[in-house]
Amino acid sequence: KALDNLHVGDYIGVKGELFTTQKGEISVLVKEFTFLSKTLRPLPEKWHGLTDQETAYRKRYLDLISNTETMDRFKFRSQFIRELRNFYAKHGFVELDTPVLQVAASGALAKPFKTHYNALDMDVYLRIAPEIYLKEAIVGGFDKIFEIARVFRNEGMDASHLQEFTMVEHYASYWDYKDNMKFTEEMFVEIVGKLKGSMNITIPNREGELVSVDLTPPWDRKTPRELNIADSGL
């Protein structure tokens, strides 16, 4: 009778014996159970999951419960950030946190979000980039610095642009663009190799279509002039 009150999404505590099904799934032969938490609203149907993309974006908790791919994506991001920090630390970089509220929008050509600082009675802006403060730190004496920064841009959005996103910036004294190209290549090759076990990855393009990308080094080096000539046909 008590089973009639159980629904998908309920949390229960159980006592019983562990066993493995014919398909190899570890299960529990329940002898006793108690309610821990009752779901107040029904979850998406078990087999089809959450199919409405708008609902998935606005109610991420439903997306996480319904789609293991979403959970895996969050876990992969966490692993990537951890390996990214390890890579920077291994190469002698110091991580900094620069101000999110700034008196002037700087570091990129983008429209900022504006808010008001009540204590000082002044308008401030959510940062559009951490660049200026990081460069000031280099002037102050740091040799190698980086930041994994949340930034905000009050502009349009598409599959590759959001108003709030994470930006990674680093600066190293006496490096030129060739040093940065080499460093960036080594970064992606090492981190992707650790996390994916392959240099071939699949990612969405600007249109949302999945495309295959080969990160096997060495990467092609092209100057802006070479790319302009190739794209314009001149």
Predicted features along the sequence, with ranges:
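Class II aminoacyl-tRNA synthetase catalytic cores and aaRS-like
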Residues: 1-234
